[in-house]
């Protein structure tokens, strides 16, 4: 009888321990994925007119124009590929795993202290969505936390491997539109290409509505040209991008005092002028044969490969000797 009572007591104790362990696990690991904290995606991206990206040392404020391009406060255009990725993140973001409840506080504090805050606003400056992103210690995964929420989540982006929050840590110059030349043939009114060290290669191509295009040399004398060469040349003026921008005013000022390789001025039919100046890159006294600097109208220094700009900086002989 005593043995049976002891067995019952032991079973009762084990049962109580099991219940306590289960409750502890539930309290530490269970989350309601349908809760407000778990609603991490943006409901209506078409209503977004402004995006604030607040970092530890600075902030980016992006605004949408009527023509669907996005600009920064300095009026520089935002790289459209980055905007596309931002909206992809906040339309496809998924919870990869929940965080144990006993870790919420520590992780939330780290996110609020070191993470990136992204806020989406409509035209009336009302907040549509506000969320923090933060990489894990290995910089391979991403935590997400809604503004004023208690529960952080480990999140993932379908089809993307690794920590996608790195995009929001990039310096502002990396957010600039990298395309410096992009025109359709019918947009062009005038192109001037100055070969600084070989002026006899320089030319001006003038295209006025309803008139035959004119090719001029450095002395402003007209030259006959191949129409095939002209058509081919105008197709070169598309999607010409820098590799990256360098945010160094001292470098800009220094280059502006030296002799360039080329000067390119493009005037479109709306009288907008795109003036670009290209300079050699010198490393330990040697000229880089693959890349050069470019000074843009927006006061930026870019690095661009010669193979991208050489088709634009053709000599006048390209038009006069085409097919010979």
Indicate residue ranges for each PLM-predicted region.
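Soluble, acidic/polar mature domains that operate outside membranes
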Residues: 1-324
């Amino acid at each position: 009888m005593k043995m049976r009572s002891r067995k019952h007591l032991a079973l009762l104790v084990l049962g109580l321990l099991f219940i306590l362990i289960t409750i502890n696990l539930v309290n530490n690991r269970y989350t309601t994925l349908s809760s407000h904290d778990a609603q991490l995606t943006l409901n209506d991206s078409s209503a977004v007119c402004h995006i604030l990206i607040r970092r530890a040392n600075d902030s980016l404020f992006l605004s949408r124009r009527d023509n669907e391009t996005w600009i920064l406060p300095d009026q520089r255009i935002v790289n459209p590929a980055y905007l596309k990725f931002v909206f992809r993140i906040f339309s496809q973001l998924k919870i990869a795993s929940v965080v144990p409840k006993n870790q919420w506080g520590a992780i939330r504090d780290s996110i609020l202290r070191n993470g990136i805050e992204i806020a989406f606003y409509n035209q009336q400056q009302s907040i549509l969505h506000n969320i923090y992103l933060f990489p894990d210690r290995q910089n391979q995964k991403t935590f997400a936390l809604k503004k004023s929420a208690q529960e952080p989540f480990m999140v993932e982006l379908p089809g993307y491997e690794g920590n996608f929050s790195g995009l929001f840590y990039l310096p502002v110059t990396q957010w600039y539109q990298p395309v410096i030349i992009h025109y359709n043939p019918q947009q062009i009114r005038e192109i001037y290409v100055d070969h600084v060290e070989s002026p006899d290669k320089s030319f001006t191509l003038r295209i006025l509505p309803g008139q035959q295009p004119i090719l001029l040399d450095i002395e402003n004398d007209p030259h006959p040209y191949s129409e095939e060469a002209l058509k081919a040349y105008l197709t070169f003026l598309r999607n010409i991008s820098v590799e990256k921008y360098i945010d160094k005013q001292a470098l800009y000022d220094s280059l502006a005092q030296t002799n360039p390789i080329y000067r390119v001025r493009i005037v479109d039919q709306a009288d907008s002028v795109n003036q670009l100046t290209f300079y050699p890159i010198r490393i330990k006294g040697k000229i880089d044969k693959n890349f050069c600097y470019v000074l843009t109208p927006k006061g930026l220094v870019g690095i661009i490969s010669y193979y991208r700009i050489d088709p634009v900086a053709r000599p006048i002989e390209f038009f006069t000797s085409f097919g010979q």
